[in-house]
């Protein structure tokens, strides 16, 4: 069953009845060319291993990449396997740059857990930059974590966060 449509409709159907959204592509299209060049977007593949596109992801072998995401990126975001049905995210591993964007489709009953995890990530970024790099602290302070009308939890912690957030929200609603 695939539902495809144009125009506005009530969101009375469950998220699972809708066609699967390409969260990686939505993040890619919502952010700057520079971010696409330098920051990989990772997600979980059909086989349960993590995969990534863009940024420096091509420099990794598949297993290496999956391990890096599992051991470094996912703990940063605080997301555990049982908290989501689908996601795509991108975070900077550099300590001198605040950067994190994510779209997470929470597992049933886990929306608040996802919001709390992503809020904790943002607070951690704010705390680490508060007395370190003022420009990065400003970026972290403008970060947003919100549940959008389509049910996904979106985190935007980057330059021009309002624009990136609106781009993601618009693409998810399409």
Regions found by a protein language model. Give the residues of each.
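C-terminal motif of bacterial Sec signal peptides marking the signal peptidase cleavage site
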Residues: 2-5
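Bacterial signal peptide processing site
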Residues: 7-10
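Sec-exported extracytoplasmic/periplasmic mature domains
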Residues: 31-35, 109, 119, 123, ...
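Early exported N-terminus immediately downstream of N-terminal targeting peptides
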Residues: 18-74
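Extracytoplasmic/secreted envelope proteins and their assembly/folding machinery
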Residues: 20, 24-27, 101, 111, ...
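Short, compositionally biased low-complexity segments enriched in polar/charged residues
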Residues: 49-99, 113-114, 141-143
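Short Gly/Thr-rich strand-loop-strand
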Residues: 111-149
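A short, solvent-exposed beta-edge/loop patch
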Residues: 93-94, 103-105, 136-174
């Amino acid at each position: 069953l695939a539902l495809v449509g144009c125009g506005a409709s009530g969101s009375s159907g469950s998220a699972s009845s809708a066609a699967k959204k390409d969260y990686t592509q939505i993040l890619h299209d919502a952010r700057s060319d520079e971010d696409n060049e330098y920051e990989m977007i990772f997600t979980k593949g059909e086989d349960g291993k993590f995969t990534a596109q863009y940024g420096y992801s091509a420099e990794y072998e598949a297993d290496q990449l999956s391990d890096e995401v599992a051991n470094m990126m996912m703990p940063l975001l605080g997301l555990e396997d049982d908290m989501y049905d689908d996601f795509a995210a991108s975070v900077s591993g550099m300590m001198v740059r605040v950067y994190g964007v994510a779209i997470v489709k929470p597992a049933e009953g886990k929306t608040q857990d996802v919001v709390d995890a992503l809020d904790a990530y943002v607070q951690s970024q704010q705390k680490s930059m508060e007395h370190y790099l003022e420009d990065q602290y400003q970026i972290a302070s403008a970060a947003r974590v919100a549940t959008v009308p389509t049910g996904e939890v979106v985190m935007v912690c980057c330059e021009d966060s309002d624009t990136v957030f609106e781009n993601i929200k618009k693409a998810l609603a399409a």
